[in-house]
């Protein structure tokens, strides 16, 4: 297994380009299964989960055509099997996203129960109940979800999400795109990635309104056609590099991004003392060599502060002036990185769903281990400001969400290298 070795102390300075958003790319790739012709999706990030999804299509008999810029063409008409096998699904929770499109387009699907990050319980029952509301018959047996559409296909339905679920909203929205009649999804997720998926389906000829609000209305159409679509930028990658510059007292300009989908994070960075300027597709942050001030924050569904940026701000608070409380309301077990940060000298107390972080002047390099995707990013940020060397093990977690993290950080002046395990 690869490891990262980071020598702390370098002040980051420079410009980088932001990759496409994994959390938009995965549902958009799943939605290509709805089309009645070839679909091209561009600006895909070079990540393990993306290649797993493309490999899953290959297993189903579809032959994706990939160019060197990681734009992919998929023609779902060549599908031969409607099974998403466990050996692929177990490494990637997002594979549940093929369930809705396959039942809607082909009338049946068999998808293994998913794997992925070990955060909280993340139930799939909302996906199942939503499809059942549209008339699907579903059995869960032998670790597989087996779904069949009723004769004549799925029917539009009114469905209320009793908890806000991003993938649940996406799965039911995709299924509803080809269902007969109108579907109304209430208490739907409002994330920008949901909006991106709706825009993609509409680009294929779908009729979805209200994405980005908590009520989405979908009028099913008879068929969806070919389209060419570019995935939105990754707001979490954007935020992570902004925090990296902030913790080191440095300056960064992130390009090919969208400041409007990161407002809660930018507000907290300003509160921490950062100077921030934005343009249509760029954000510039400058700390002018200052140590950040600790901030209080509470994670909540979009447009509030994103849970996927929580760990990065614990790193910021760990070396900030003062004390900050971080309250996690989305997932349980999301403070796993705290115990690794203790090894570096961070002063963090966890009480239930709250981490109280008292900033110290300096962290110390230490061997640490990544536990999940965003937690591992926080260890990288802490290592950038720690005295001496930090060795981060199990970085396959990082590679699931960050494209070429060491190369991008090197471009900003970080002393970081990957060593084979």
Curated annotation (Swiss-Prot):
The modification 2-(S-cysteinyl)pyruvic acid O-phosphothioketal is found at residue 117. InterPro entries: Enolpyruvate_Tfrase_dom, Enolpyruvate_Tfrase_sf, MurA_subfamily, RNA3'P_cycl/enolpyr_Trfase_a/b, UDP_GlcNAc_COvinyl_MurA. Coiled coil: none annotated. UDP-N-acetyl-alpha-D-glucosamine binds at residues 93, 122-126, 308, 330. It is an enzyme of class 2 (transferase). Cell wall formation. Adds enolpyruvyl to UDP-N-acetylglucosamine. It comes from Pseudomonas putida (strain ATCC 47054 / DSM 6125 / CFBP 8728 / NCIMB 11950 / KT2440). The active site is at 117 (proton donor). It catalyses: phosphoenolpyruvate + UDP-N-acetyl-alpha-D-glucosamine = UDP-N-acetyl-3-O-(1-carboxyvinyl)-alpha-D-glucosamine + phosphate. Signal peptide: none annotated. Its EC number is 2.5.1.7. The keyword rRNA-binding does not apply. Gene3D superfamilies: Enolpyruvate transferase domain. It holds the Pfam family EPSP_synthase. One of its GO terms (molecular function) is UDP-N-acetylglucosamine 1-carboxyvinyltransferase activity. Keywords: Cell cycle, Cell division, Cell shape, Cell wall biogenesis/degradation, Cytoplasm, Peptidoglycan synthesis, Pyruvate, Transferase. CDD domains: UdpNAET. Its main location: cytoplasm. Phosphoenolpyruvate binds at residues 22-23. This is UDP-N-acetylglucosamine 1-carboxyvinyltransferase.
């Amino acid at each position: 297994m690869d490891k990262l070795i980071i020598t702390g102390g370098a002040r980051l300075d420079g410009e980088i380009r932001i990759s496409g958003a994994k959390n938009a790319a995965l549902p958009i790739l799943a939605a290509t299964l709805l089309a009645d012709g070839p679909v091209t999706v561009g600006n895909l990030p070079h990540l393990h989960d993306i290649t797993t999804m493309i490999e899953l299509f290959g297993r189903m008999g579809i032959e994706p055509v990939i160019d060197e810029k990681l734009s992919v063409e998929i023609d779902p008409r060549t599908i031969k099997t409607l099974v998403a096998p466990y050996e692929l699904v177990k490494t990637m929770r997002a594979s549940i996203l093929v369930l809705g499109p396959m039942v809607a387009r082909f009338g049946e699907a068999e998808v293994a129960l998913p794997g992925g990050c070990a955060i909280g319980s993340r139930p799939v029952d909302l996906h199942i109940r939503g499809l059942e509301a549209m008339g699907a018959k579903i059995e869960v047996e032998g670790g597989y979800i087996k779904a069949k559409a009723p004769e004549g296909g799925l029917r539009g339905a009114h469905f209320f999400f009793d908890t806000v679920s991003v993938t649940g909203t996406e799965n039911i929205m995709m299924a509803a795109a080809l269902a007969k009649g109108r579907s109304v999804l209430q208490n739907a997720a409002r994330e920008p990635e949901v909006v991106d998926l709706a825009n993609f389906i509409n680009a294929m000829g779908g009729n979805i309104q209200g994405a980005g609000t908590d009520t989405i209305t979908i009028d099913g159409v008879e068929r969806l056609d070919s389209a060419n679509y570019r995935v939105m930028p990754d707001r979490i990658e954007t935020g992570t590099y902004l925090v990296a510059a902030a913790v080191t007292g440095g300056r960064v300009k992130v390009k090919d991004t969208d400041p409007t989908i990161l407002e809660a994070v930018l507000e907290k960075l300003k509160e921490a003392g950062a100077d921030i300027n934005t343009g249509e597709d760029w954000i510039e942050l400058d700390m002018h060599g200052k140590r950040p001030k600790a901030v209080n924050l509470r994670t909540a569904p979009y447009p509030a502060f994103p849970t996927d940026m929580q760990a990065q701000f614990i790193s910021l608070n760990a070396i900030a002036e003062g004390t900050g409380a971080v309250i996690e309301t989305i997932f349980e077990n999301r403070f796993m990185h705290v115990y690794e940060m203790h090894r570096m000298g961070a002063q963090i107390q966890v009480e239930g769903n709250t981490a109280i972080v008292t900033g110290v002047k300096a962290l110390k390099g230490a061997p640490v281990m990544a536990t999940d995707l965003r937690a591992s990013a926080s260890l990288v940020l802490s290592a950038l400001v720690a005295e001496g060397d930090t060795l981060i093990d199990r970085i396959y977690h990082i590679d699931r969400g960050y494209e070429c993290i060491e190369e991008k950080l090197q471009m900003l002046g970080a002393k970081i290298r990957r060593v084979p395990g």
